[in-house]
């Protein structure tokens, strides 16, 4: 299952998982046509796929989504908890609704989806023909789990919280052979941040923060997710893989600060 999978990074991850041979549930909250298009692309690789509409911040909808998945797909092996959004504002102007919406989707959504997945992982246990692990969870975080971001306090708080959520969950579940990791994308060309890259001036400014000198593409993250979910990464647990062109290297200090 990939949540928030009808656009951007989620879409790329869902397609890459299908290309790698996985059956895929494409979760989305709005945009039926886009979700169905992703499903058709995935089916083109000869695997099963279906689009499930659910708000990941809603406990009842998440429970119903997983119940449907168990009925139609039998089980779950990999959860990519990708759904996320921004509601930006200066701190003194930020409303409680903006705060709650971001925390609800970006952090509570991780909790609700992971809880359902872990219940199934523990019920089923390891299937050696499928994986060395009983289950894999990938939390889609951000470089802003460690980089402060003024004007985006709710978003950065959700990602910082996600880091400790992921690590605590990984610690708790490791004895059950369940792996939990995060991916922290940096500047990536997606609909959520169009204003940061859609003009030359904006792009040039953004590149001052990226030592590698190019914007990331959703496929950069998708390929990382496929690897992290595979048995090639079986000994990796409780870690964040930053896919960021070096944004977390504090580029302002490259010339002595």
Regions found by a protein language model. Give the residues of each.
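Residue(s) in the substrate-gating loop at a strand-loop-helix junction
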Residues: 142
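The beta1-alpha1 cofactor-binding region of Rossmann-like NAD(H)/NADP(H)-dependent oxidoreductases
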Residues: 32-33, 53-65, 96, 219-220
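Substrate-binding pocket helix/loop in short-chain dehydrogenase/reductase
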Residues: 90-91, 98-103, 206
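Short, small/polar-rich loop/turn modules that mediate ligand/substrate recognition or access, typified
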Residues: 174, 179, 236-238
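Short C-terminal tail/terminal secondary-structure segment
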Residues: 147, 226, 237-257
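Conserved glycine-rich cofactor-binding loop
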Residues: 6-7
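Active-site helix of classical SDR
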Residues: 114, 158, 166
């Amino acid at each position: 299952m990939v949540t928030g999978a009808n656009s951007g990074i989620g879409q790329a991850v869902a397609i890459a998982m299908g290309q790698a041979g996985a059956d895929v549930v494409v979760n989305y909250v709005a945009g039926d046509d886009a979700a169905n298009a992703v499903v058709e692309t995935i089916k083109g690789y000869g695997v099963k796929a279906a689009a499930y509409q659910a708000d990941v911040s809603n406990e009842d909808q998440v429970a119903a989504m997983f119940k449907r998945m168990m009925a139609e797909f039998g089980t779950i092996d990999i959860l990519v908890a990708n759904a996320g959004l921004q509601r930006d504002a200066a701190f003194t102007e930020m409303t409680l609704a903006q705060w709650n919406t971001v925390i609800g989707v970006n952090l509570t959504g991780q909790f609700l989806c992971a809880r359902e997945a872990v219940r199934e992982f523990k019920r089923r246990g390891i299937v050696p023909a499928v994986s060395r692990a009983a289950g894999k969870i990938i939390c889609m975080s951000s470089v802003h789990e460690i980089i402060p971001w003024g004007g985006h306090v709710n978003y950065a708080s959700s990602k910082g919280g996600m880091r400790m959520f992921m690590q605590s969950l990984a610690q708790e579940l490791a004895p059950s052979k369940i792996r939990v990791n995060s991916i922290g994308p940096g500047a990536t060309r997606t609909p959520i941040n169009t204003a940061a890259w859609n003009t030359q001036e904006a792009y040039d400014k953004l590149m001052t923060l990226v030592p590698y000198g190019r914007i990331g593409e959703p496929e950069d993250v998708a390929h990382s997710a496929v690897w992290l979910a595979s048995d090639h990464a079986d000994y990796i647990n409780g870690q964040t893989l930053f896919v960021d062109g070096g944004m977390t290297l504090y580029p302002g200090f490259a010339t002595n600060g």
